[in-house]
Amino acid sequence: MNQTGRRFFLKAWLASVAELARPGLEEGGDSLARASTLAVPQASVSTPSFKLGLVTYNLARDWDIDTIIKNCELTGFEGVELRTTHKHGVEISLSKERRADVRKRFADSRVRLVSLGTTCEYESPDAAVVEKNIEETRRWCGLAQDLGCMGVKVRPNGFPASVSQEKTLQQIGQALAKCGDAARDHGVEIWLEVHGPGTQLPPNIHRMLTVADHPSVGACWNSNPTDVEGGSIRKSFELLKPWIRSCHINDLYRKNYPWRELMTLLRAINFNRYTFAEISEPSCEPIRFMDYYRALWDYTAGEARP
C-alpha cells in the first residue's frame, strides 16, 4: 500500500472511532456490507434516500468501462459520473454504435450511468469562446440523452480580471439559460458545479442560477471548504437548496468539513439522487479503498438525521 493509501485508512479508522465517542450515540444496527476489515462502529442507522456514486476524477481516471462497472459492483457504488478525457473514452465524438454499446453495458449492470462531467465554462470575456462552450454543451446533452443519463455537469472557473464580477455572473447565467434549453430538448439537466476561484462562493453560484432561471438548470454541490462558515454549511446550503440536483463529496475523514451536517441537510430536502465520491488521487488498492469509503459513507449517511 502506498503512503496515500495508508494515511487514508488510518484517518478513516480514527474518524470512525471519534464518531463512536460522541455522546448520545446508541449502539446497535446492522453490519456494514463488505467492510469487515475496517473497525467501523455499529450505530443506530437508517437507510438514506440518496445513494453513493463515483466520479471517475481521479480514482478511476485510468479505468475502462468494464473496470468501472466491475469495481463499482464489487464495492456497492451505485452510480457513476464519467469525467471527460479519461480512459473510459466516453466523449461527444462517440459514434452512434458505440453510444448504444455503452448504454447497454451500464443497463445490463447494477451501476447507473448518471451523468457526464464536462469542462464547459462560460466566463470568458471573448463572446466567441462562450458560444463555442455553449455549442459543446449542446452536444454533451445529445450524448447524455443517447446514453440514458440524467445530467451534464458544467462549471464556472473563476473571474476574468478584465471584467466586473457582476457582468461575469450575468454572462454565465445567460449562457446557462441557453444550455438549459438544449438540456430540456434532450430530456436531461444541466448541473452547475460549485467550482472555481471566487466563482465557487455560494452567493455567486446563487446569482448565476437566479439569472439563468431555467427549470432544467440546477447545481452540483461540491463540498468545498468555502461552504463552511463558523463550522457549519447551513447558510451556504440554504442559498443553493432550491437548485441542488447532484452532489460531489470527497475525503470523508476531513474534520474541517461537516459531513454529517451535509447528509442531514440532504435528507431534510428529500434528496434522492447521488452523492458522488470525487477522489483526487488514484489508489494502488482501489477495491480496498472503495470498501473503506463505502463503510464510512454508510456510517455517516445512515447516522445523519433530518
Residue ranges and their predicted role:
Residues 85, 121, 157, 252, ...:
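Flexible loop residues that form catalytic
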Residues 78, 112, 150, 272-273:
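Short acidic/polar active-site loop segments enriched in Thr and Asp
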